[in-house]
UniProtKB/Swiss-Prot annotation:
One BP annotation, GO: epoxygenase P450 pathway
Catalytic activity: an organic molecule + reduced [NADPH--hemoprotein reductase] + O2 = an alcohol + oxidized [NADPH--hemoprotein reductase] + H2O + H(+)
Name of the protein this chain belongs to: Cytochrome P450 2F1
Sites where the protein binds heme: 436
């Protein structure tokens, strides 16, 4: 690009930023925050290598509620359990909008369930929850699917024969098959090219969006669209995933029986047919493709990433692993796989899983929210349409809620009698109106997968347990666990 073109591009960017800044000066009394620079906002204060740490550091200076400018975009940041709970739970309706997330929104155009707002979001969410329940989410039928898939996973793990291996791909394939069976009506063989493509695309995008490139794109999307870098693969990957889903939808249309839909896609197609004469219907091809995309992405990555963190923690703390295995042997034995009915009798295992989720904190900054109306909150007035970042990391590491927040400690979820205890500050699935609709499915998968694996194997690191690093490789959209290999020793 020559110097004249560069100058024109920078001038246009400056004009856009100026217009955005002027348009944001509407009514309202926002909390204080660092003074922004023109165009850059507070970018110089925010270390692009670690946005989370930078925002958390600002909360120590400005308190649990402050205003920050991500480039030209003005955002309110909430930190700590009390502030986040008051927003997402106590005033859930006002904070139920979806904030701007260019890496997702520029692709979904607000058509998917995760990145829509208003009536569209409410209609799609209600419909999706009902269909997922109909197909067994939280019930015995989905438990049977998980147990079946768990058996396939155990067979794959046995093939390692005690040799070192990276569990990333085998875990992702198995976990993804659960949501695939709900969305598409059947599971894939582990060597099926469609499943391998799904895993590759989702893993690549999650990694990019959890990197400095992903964070920078979400601050300056218009500029970064013209800059080469790994962020350019985000939309290429999303398009490939969309095309794969569209091909499956085409096959589903050919075999659709409206009287007996066999999976989520066919239920959605049936609803589309019922409302085809309604010009205001939210059920059309774009919302089907994007909702399926959102469910596939979330249903694949959150559980598999949590299992990766769990493996690392259990290898670093072998006494914790041994105690979980002792509880499995006592309650379940070896003659059958663990079942959900066992969870109530396994408080320590339940506490360990919750502590993994708290400590791993895989979506540390949550997805952005947006206030749906002018909102009075904590003595301030947040104008309608203002984006809000709720730092879930500061909830999960809040010293007022957890005795030793910086340590991996299952006792955080056990009472004096060693019975399981809930914590209101446990928010790995967010909270309030935007609570992840796959929460119950994810909790089932985590319990059934982890107990089945530890019933059959012991996890052994290649080096000393104390050398295992539990800090994330990078933080952005998610906290990425560090790559590792391990050996599985049959029990």
């Amino acid at each position: 690009m020559d110097s004249i073109s560069t100058a024109i591009l920078l001038l246009l960017l400056a004009l856009v930023c100026l217009l955005l800044t002027l348009s944001s000066r509407d009514k309202g009394k926002l909390p204080p925050g660092p003074r922004p620079l023109s165009i850059l906002g507070n970018l110089l204060l925010l270390c692009s290598q670690d946005m989370l740490t930078s925002l958390t550091k600002l909360s120590k200076e400005y308190g649990s509620m402050y205003t920050v400018h991500l480039g030209p975009r003005r955002v309110v940041v909430l930190s700590g359990y009390q502030a986040v709970k008051e927003a997402l739970v106590d005033q859930g309706e006002e904070f139920s909008g979806r904030g701007d997330y260019p890496a997702f929104f520029n692709f979904t155009k607000g058509n998917g369930i995760a990145f829509s707002s208003g009536d569209r979001w409410k209609v799609l969410r209600q419909f999706s929850i009902q269909i997922l329940r109909n197909f067994g989410m939280g019930k015995r039928s989905i438990e049977e699917r998980i147990l079946e898939e768990g058996s396939f996973l155990l067979a794959e793990l046995r093939k390692t024969e005690g040799e070192p291996f990276d569990p990333t791909f085998v875990l992702s394939r198995s976990v993804s098959n659960i949501i695939c069976s709900v969305l598409f009506g059947s599971r894939f063989d582990y060597d099926d090219e469609r499943l391998l493509t799904i895993i590759r695309l989702i893993n690549d995008n999650f990694q990019i969006m959890s990197s400095p490139w992903g964070e920078l794109y979400d601050i300056f999307p218009s500029l970064l669209d013209w800059v080469p870098g790994p962020h350019q693969r985000i939309f290429q990957n999303f398009k490939c995933l969309r095309d794969l889903i569209a091909h499956s939808v085409h096959d589903h249309q050919a075999s659709l029986d409206p009287r007996s839909p066999r999976d989520f896609i066919q239920c959605f197609l049936t609803k589309m047919a019922e409302e085809k004469e309604d010009p205001l219907s939210h059920f059309h091809m774009d919302t089907l493709l994007m909702t399926t995309h959102n469910l596939l992405f979330g249903g694949t990555k959150t559980v598999s990433t949590t299992l990766h963190h769990a493996f690392l923690a259990l290898m670093k703390y072998p006494k914790v692993q041994a105690r979980v295995q002792e509880e499995i042997d006592l309650v379940v034995g070896r003659a059958r796989l663990p079942a959900l009915k066992d969870r109530a009798a396994m408080p320590y295992t339940d506490a360990v899983i919750h502590e993994v989720q708290r400590f791993a904190d895989i979506i540390p900054m949550n997805l952005p929210h947006r206030v749906t109306r002018d909102t009075a909150f904590r003595g301030f007035l947040i104008p309608k349409g203002t984006d809000v970042i709720t730092l879930l990391n500061t909830v999960h590491y809040d010293p007022s809620q957890f005795l030793t927040p910086q340590e991996f400690n299952p006792e955080h979820f056990l009472d004096a009698n060693q019975s399981f205890k809930k914590s209101p500050a446990f928010m790995p699935f967010s909270a309030g109106r935007r609570l992840c609709l796959g929460e119950s499915l994810a909790r089932m998968e985590l319990f059934l997968y982890l107990t089945a694996i530890l019933q059959s194997f012991s996890l052994q690191p290649l080096g000393a347990p104390e050398d295992i690093d539990l800090t994330p490789l990078s933080s952005g959209l998610g906290n990425l666990p560090r790559p590792f290999q391990l050996c599985l020793r049959p029990r």
